[in-house]
């Protein structure tokens, strides 16, 4: 069989360790929230940025 660089079992183990560990989950949620706020800010400025020009 072909040796994959990243096997399915390694991906499952990574997912399990990131989701089911409370400390890592809290950090991941903070990161996702920050990413969402950034993306929302970019969309807001692209949509309504011309109204903010002085």
UniProtKB/Swiss-Prot annotation:
Reported tissue expression: Expressed in roots, flowers, young cotyledons and leaves.
Domain of life: Eukaryota
Chief place of localization: mitochondrion
Regions of this protein lying in the Cytoplasmic compartment: 2-30
Listed GO biological process terms: protein transport
Membrane topology: Single-pass membrane protein
GO cellular component: mitochondrial outer membrane translocase complex; mitochondrion; plasma membrane
Parts of the chain that traverse the membrane: 31-48
Localization, UniProt: Mitochondrion outer membrane
Keywords: Membrane, Mitochondrion, Mitochondrion outer membrane, Protein transport, Transmembrane, Transmembrane helix, Transport
Keyword Lipid metabolism: no
Record's keyword annotation contains Transmembrane: yes
Role played: A component of the complex responsible for the recognition and translocation of cytosolically synthesized mitochondrial preproteins.
Family: Belongs to the Tom5 family.
Record note on quaternary structure: Forms part of the receptor complex that consists of at least 6 different proteins (TOM5, TOM6, TOM7, TOM20, TOM22/TOM9 and TOM40).
This protein's name: Mitochondrial import receptor subunit TOM5 homolog
Lineage per the UniProt record: Eukaryota, Viridiplantae, Streptophyta, Embryophyta, Tracheophyta
Encoding gene (name): TOM5
């Amino acid at each position: 069989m072909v040796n994959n660089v990243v096997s399915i079992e390694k991906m499952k183990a990574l997912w399990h360790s990131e989701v089911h560990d409370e400390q890592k989950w809290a950090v991941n949620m903070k990161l996702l929230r920050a990413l969402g706020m950034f993306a929302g800010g970019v969309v807001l400025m692209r949509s309504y940025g011309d109204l903010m020009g002085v």
